[in-house]
């Protein structure tokens, strides 16, 4: 199944205040943008970056910034919660092999975190396209394909 990110409604969406630690982390990310959209960079070449997200039940990937066009595919089914830059908190149920695409125009970006609120390991593969409207952000030192 291929669905645009904006075409799939969340299972739950709230606009309530975030916990203080989450809000503080979001503020830090706004001052020091985090380009690491996965837990591990698997591959990088002149055209793409390929990431994996692997989160045990209860684990969380901190705030990160999408500036490139990308897609992700859920390898395992799970439930996730994300705090999104518009101040909302959303929850989704992910099915194995579910794929979604994100496209960002010049100067646009998306910031969010991701927490596995399911009972099983959450695994996604993310592919970013470097020939997008925005230039790729530099990766932190020490982040290299594994």
Q: Positions of the model-derived regions?
A:
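A short, N-terminal "cap"/entry segment at the start of jelly-roll beta-barrel domains
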Residues: 2-52, 82-84, 89-111, 115, ...
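Active-site scaffold segments
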Residues: 71-74, 102, 124-125
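Glycine- and acidic-residue-biased ligand/ion/polar-headgroup-sensing regions
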Residues: 66-86
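Short, surface-exposed binding/anchoring microloops in extracellular/periplasmic proteins
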Residues: 44-46, 53-68
């Amino acid at each position: 199944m291929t669905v645009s990110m904006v075409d799939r409604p969340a299972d739950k969406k709230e606009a309530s205040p975030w916990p203080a630690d989450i809000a503080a982390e979001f503020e830090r990310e706004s001052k020091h943008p985090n380009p690491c959209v996965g837990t591990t960079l698997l591959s990088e070449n002149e055209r793409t970056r390929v990431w994996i997200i692997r989160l045990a039940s209860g684990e969380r990937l901190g705030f990160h910034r999408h500036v490139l066009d990308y897609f992700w595919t859920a390898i395992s089914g799970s439930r996730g919660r994300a705090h999104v830059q518009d101040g909302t908190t959303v929850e989704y149920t992910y099915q194995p092999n579910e794929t979604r695409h994100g496209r960002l125009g010049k100067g646009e970006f998306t910031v969010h975190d991701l927490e596995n609120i399911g009972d099983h390991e959450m695994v996604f593969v993310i592919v970013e396209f470097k020939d997008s409207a925005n230039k790729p952000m530099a990766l932190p030192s020490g982040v290299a394909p594994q």
